[in-house]
Design a protein with these regions (language model features):
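N-terminal transmembrane-helix/juxtamembrane module of multi-pass inner/ER membrane proteins
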Residues: 1-47, 79-105
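N-terminal signal-anchor transmembrane alpha helix
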Residues: 66-81
Length: 181
């Protein structure tokens, strides 16, 4: 195993090579660009912040508040994890990766993937219908793939984001009875 030292943390080049191969394969599908941009926007902080007033005033104030609290928690934790893990973005590592957007922060874990699982997952749980769970799962998958396609995350970043989002979602669901009191 070859490792590269950056900021005293070893980076596994074999893993990066594999992730770069996936990204470059995905980016070879030019027809998918508009779909991937749209999918990525569904996991963006801006989209979720714009959705909060609708959820609060038009859907259910208590559930809208819970989703808003999850968003603040997820976003804050993601910012801390990015600084702690300081993983590079694909376009920082390989100039062959076409960055469809640039980000000033580190890449690990993917905030879009993390927010997708925590927010879309919580929304599905609150709706508690099969179609909502399927929609949430499909949306999370598409958002994660879009982040690799757009060249802003390695698949490992996306997997880590999904994992952190799942932990937040599970913790939130477990804490709901206490929060409702």
């Amino acid at each position: 195993m070859i490792t590269l030292r950056k900021r005293s943390k070893p980076i596994n080049l074999n893993m990066i090579d594999t992730d770069l191969s996936i990204i470059l394969f995905l980016q070879g599908q030019d027809w998918a660009t508009p779909i991937m941009r749209l999918a990525s926007s569904l996991g963006s902080l801006e989209f979720m912040l714009l959705s909060m007033p609708f959820l609060y005033w038009c859907w259910d104030a208590k559930q809208g508040f819970m989703i808003g609290l999850m968003l603040v928690t997820s976003h804050g934790l993601n910012a801390v994890l990015k600084v702690a893990l300081h993983g590079p973005r694909p376009y920082w590592v390989d100039p062959a990766v076409q960055a469809q957007s640039t980000q000033p922060s580190f890449g690990m874990p993917s905030g879009h993937a993390q927010n997708a699982v925590s927010i879309w997952g919580l929304t599905a749980h609150l709706i508690h219908k099969r179609w909502a769970y399927l929609l949430a799962a499909g949306t999370c998958l598409l958002i994660g793939l879009s982040r690799a396609y757009l060249g802003v995350h390695f698949m490992g970043d996306v997997l880590a984001g999904w994992g952190v989002g799942a932990v937040l979602l599970g913790s939130s669901i477990k804490a709901m009875p206490v929060m409702e009191e």
